[in-house]
């Protein structure tokens, strides 16, 4: 798909805007890193312009990818990690399926039963109850899963949840690249799209698991989804 050149009320063409948003959410780049990469191509803009594009268009890209990505498996891994935002601790709840597809991330202040209920409610609004949910030994999961997913088998064992724990690694790398996270709303927006981009460009492409021809086909399919979302920016 070829992108139309112009985006209403914007000075730069759609192809540049969509690439800048993709670079920020696909790789461990800061806004200034992307500014420099584009400058190497002769595209002169400020890092604030890149930031504004990401803030404005992230939710649109996330929603389009969510509609087009493949359905998750019937086995989910739920896990939490602590992130600091301006020095204040927050709990990031994350759910992935057995193949590494990220279902959702949700930033909260607590790691208690109420927080688990809110997270499960978000998941179940988007996906049917799975066959199995794997968690660590956090007791906050026990009753919410029992009553909200009555037919789901709950496996609570730290050693079984490596898939969930490994899913946090891209977040840690991005956090290190940015030095620190600065706002809860910004982190939620950033990580929500990062997960969806990773689903189609990393998990589905399978950089280390598939032969080159299959990777190229999978990348082309992921790119088609991204360009479709980019073309829809004119309707916002």
Say what each PLM segment does.
Residues 1-236:
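Residue-level recognition of single "structural anchor" positions
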């Amino acid at each position: 798909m070829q992108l139309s050149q112009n985006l209403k009320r914007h000075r730069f063409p759609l192809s540049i805007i969509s690439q800048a948003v993709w670079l920020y959410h696909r790789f461990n780049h800061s806004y200034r890193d992307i500014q420099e990469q584009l400058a190497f191509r002769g595209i002169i803009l400020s890092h604030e312009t890149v930031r504004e594009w990401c803030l404005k268009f992230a939710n649109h890209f996330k929603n389009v990818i969510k509609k087009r990505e493949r359905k998750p498996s019937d086995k989910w891994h739920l896990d939490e990690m602590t992130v600091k935002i301006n020095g204040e601790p927050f709990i990031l709840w994350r759910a992935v399926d057995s193949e590494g597809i990220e279902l959702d991330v949700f930033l909260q202040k607590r790691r208690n039963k109420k927080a688990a209920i809110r997270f499960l409610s978000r998941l179940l609004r988007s996906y049917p109850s799975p066959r199995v949910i794997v968690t660590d030994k956090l007791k906050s999961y026990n009753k919410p899963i029992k009553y909200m997913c009555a037919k789901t088998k709950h496996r609570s064992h730290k050693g079984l949840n490596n898939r969930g724990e490994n899913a946090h690694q891209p977040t840690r790398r991005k956090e290190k690249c940015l030095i620190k996270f600065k706002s809860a709303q910004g982190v939620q927006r950033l990580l929500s799209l990062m997960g969806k981009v990773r689903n189609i460009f990393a998990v589905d492409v399978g950089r280390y698991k598939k032969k080159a021809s299959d990777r190229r086909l999978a990348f082309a399919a992921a790119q088609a989804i991204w360009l479709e979302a980019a073309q829809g920016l004119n309707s916002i």
